[in-house]
Amino acid sequence: MTTDPTIFDESLGKELHQPLSVARMLFSGGMTVLAFLLTAAAVVPLFAILFEILRQGFPALMKLQEVRLFGVPVPLPEVLVSLPAPEGVQDRANGFANAIVGTLMMVGVACLFSVPFGVMTGIFLAEIGKNSAIANVIRFFTVILSSVPSIVVGVFAYGVIVLTKITIPIPLLNFKIQTGGFSALAGGFALGVIMLPIIALSTEEALKLVPTHHRLASAALGGGRFQTIFRIVVTSAIPGITTGVLLAVSRAAGETAPLIFTALSSQFWPQGLFTPTPSLSVLIYGYASSPFKNQNQLAWTASVVLIGLVVLSSILSRQVTRKRLKRR
């Protein structure tokens, strides 16, 4: 016994073209309005913060100063090429170029420490250990570390690096690593501890998103376990891993509390990895509460630059991901 399919087509068509009841239309409209209001509640504060920071800090970027680059005079914002002026001094160039350099130095040190260990930890959790007891323990402590307040990390780095005097010679490079005292090395270590769990967990999630048939295809072609992991799985997950690393960099660049305990600050150019080093976040913290207007203004402008660096890293991560996906 067969059923005429046109009967179902006609009934389905009538159901689809039947007008909605007033109650359903009101409910649908109400939920749409509610969704819009909730979205606005999340977005409006963000735009309000950005607007106020740009309004207060952007005008100072319009004040230019000529700097010679490779013998050619180039006009650049004064705040990006000058050192901070002394307190209360109004008639000289006022900037935070040293804080930008110090921030990049410490984030670079943090990346040297956290990226290799974080990526390898993520690979172990996703591909090697998986659900083993060791992997579960590592995953548990990694999640806990990601939720530890940054000021606690700063106190830890203060005790381990700042208060401990150790000299580690590196004969091949004719170089010595020295701990003890406030330094960019201590600040980079603290930021690296903050970045480590973010990179590890994001790497694990990125590797889990790689389809299983990629692994099976590699095994079918004779690929070994580690060949499959590093040449197939990790390569496919590079966009996600890169995004996680850049998100961790964004988080580290905005940290203040750990750097107060480790790198402290300075009014001068960074003198190396083993001396007190300025940073944008600490400069903002100190100058925002200053009684001098020129330092208050510098705090607003430094906030604009710091947000710009974070936004730039986010855009960079998206571009890297898109290019990688297009190649595939």
Name each model-derived stretch.
Residues 204-208, 212-215, 219, 246, ...:
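C-terminal transmembrane helix and the adjacent membrane-cytosol boundary/short C-terminal tail
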Residues 1-39, 317-328:
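Transmembrane alpha-helical segments of polytopic membrane transport and secretion proteins
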Residues 14-33, 51-110, 131, 177, ...:
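Periplasmic/extracellular loop-to-transmembrane helix junction in inner-membrane transport proteins
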Residues 110-142, 163, 317-323:
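Transmembrane-helix boundary motif in ABC transporter permease subunits
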Residues 143-191:
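Generic hydrophobic transmembrane alpha-helix motif, especially the helices
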Residues 202-207, 211, 219, 225-261:
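Transmembrane alpha-helices
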Residues 101, 105-113, 117, 121, ...:
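Hydrophobic alpha-helical transmembrane segments of multipass integral membrane proteins
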Residues 259-307:
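Interhelical loop and adjacent transmembrane-helix boundary motif
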